[in-house]
Amino acid sequence: MNMLMALMVNITLSILLITVAFWLPQLNMYTEKANPYECGFDPMSSARLPFSMKFFLVAITFLLYDLEIALLLPLPWAIQMYNTNTMMLTAFILVSVLALGLAYEWTQKGLEWTE
């Protein structure tokens, strides 16, 4: 019962904070708020330049493999647990899914800079 009550309070508080965070900035909208910030000076050129998709894909790939390392770091401590089969299966599935993603990106030439 206490767990259910704590869960309901957390969900209610989260929904309330998300609602306030989306609703509050729209009350006082003016042009300076919508402009990009450039060190306190007026922008020298348009700040809405197109962004290269290659850089975006490399950044997303880096984040995915950074997350993989973060998820695999507790592996040595998890080996000391009683049920190592489940832990090893989970780690194998994680590495397999990420390897398949890398292979797919490689075959789709997402890592090629010359094109």
UniProtKB/Swiss-Prot annotation:
InterPro entries: NADH_UbQ/plastoQ_OxRdtase_su3, NDAH_ubi_oxred_su3_sf
Key words of the record: Electron transport, Membrane, Mitochondrion, Mitochondrion inner membrane, NAD, Respiratory chain, Translocase, Transmembrane, Transmembrane helix, Transport, Ubiquinone
Catalytic activity: a ubiquinone + NADH + 5 H(+)(in) = a ubiquinol + NAD(+) + 4 H(+)(out)
Subcellular location: Mitochondrion inner membrane
GO BP term, example: mitochondrial electron transport, NADH to ubiquinone
Claim: Translocase is one of the keywords in the record: yes
Gene Ontology molecular function: NADH dehydrogenase (ubiquinone) activity
Family: Belongs to the complex I subunit 3 family.
Function of the protein: Core subunit of the mitochondrial membrane respiratory chain NADH dehydrogenase (Complex I) which catalyzes electron transfer from NADH through the respiratory chain, using ubiquinone as an electron acceptor. Essential for the catalytic activity of complex I.
Name this polypeptide is given: NADH-ubiquinone oxidoreductase chain 3
